[in-house]
Amino acid sequence: MAVVSMKQLLESGVHFGHQTRRWNPKMAPYIFTSRKDIHIIDLKRTALEIEKAYAALYDIAKDGGTVLFVGTKKQASEAIKEEAIRAGQFYVDHRWLGGTLTNFKTIRQRIKLLHSLYAAEADGTWAKLPKKEVLGLSRQRIKLERFLGGIKDMQRIPQALFVVDPRTEEIAVKEARKLGIPVFGIVDTNCDPDLVDYIIPANDDAIRAVKLLTWVMANAVVEANGGVVEKYEDEENAPFEQDEPRKPSQKPKQNRPENKPRFDKQAPRAAAKPEVKAEVKPEVKPEVKVEAKVAPKVVAEVKPTEDLSTLKVAELKELAKAKGIENYSKLRKAELVEALSK
């Protein structure tokens, strides 16, 4: 029985590669075709290479070898950590520290410091220190735990290295090849397959694809150590399984003709709307009448013109404007009085 089905590979988007302009010609044997300037990986070759890598990793774990899972990309860090813990192996899910393999003695000293900080916190030593010093030690512990937490129990160099995207994990791959450690890797169409001993041509940018392939390789270690392989569960497909029991709940919605008379009873409420409009209309009419009454009052106040000489020039001009005298704005006061008195 195959370790992974073609349907799982297809649904997880394993076959999607990078843009054609970013490809590595060495990946040509693993490319099926290209669509819309994106390479499509041959899933038959992917399934074949997965079988080879699975068998090789199984043999290494069967002989008591340890595996270091490496994936510092955002798309891979979570899956790498979960599957490595499930398989009882080591992992690096954040930045790879240079010399983790080639200078393992120095790394071991940092790991010992991390363990000493754990012990000091557990036995109550930190409680006797000033708060400022405790805060500094706490920050140091968090930093060491972030980069070395996945390998804090690794006593010796691992016998295999599994990486997601050899381009991103270039330093880790170089250190492993320098020490003769076999490298298993998920290689996309923009990577160099020669850097990896056991290539898995697949999409290394999709979370679902990375999770599926990491799950498969972790199963090789679990099976070699006599563990039980868990069934693969895709979180994104889980909601579709929950939709099935909800189907019966839709039937009562179709059997609602009994409730239709209830809505008919509420019809008179809609008829009440014109009544509101009728009340608004008479309120608008008196407002117009009031405005018409104000107009004659203003004219009555302007009419008295007994002593025009006592008025100001501005007032005379307003009267001249109302009377329709031409060029009234250029006339002087005496001329305005004379024109208005005619």
Curated annotation (Swiss-Prot):
SMART domains: Rho_N
GO molecular function terms noted in the UniProt entry: structural constituent of ribosome
InterPro entries: Rho-like_N, Rho_N_sf, Ribosomal_uS2, Ribosomal_uS2_bac/mit/plastid, Ribosomal_uS2_CS, Ribosomal_uS2_flav_dom_sf
One Pfam family in the UniProt entry: Rho_N
Keywords tagged on the record: Ribonucleoprotein, Ribosomal protein
Biological process terms in GO annotation: DNA-templated transcription termination; translation
Cellular component terms (Gene Ontology): cytosolic small ribosomal subunit
Region described as Disordered: spans on this chain: 235-283
Residue spans of biased composition, Basic and acidic residues class: 255-283
Family recorded in the similarity comment: Belongs to the universal ribosomal protein uS2 family.
Family matches, as PANTHER family: 30S RIBOSOMAL PROTEIN S2 PROKARYOTIC AND ORGANELLAR, SMALL RIBOSOMAL SUBUNIT PROTEIN US2M
Stated name of the protein: Small ribosomal subunit protein uS2
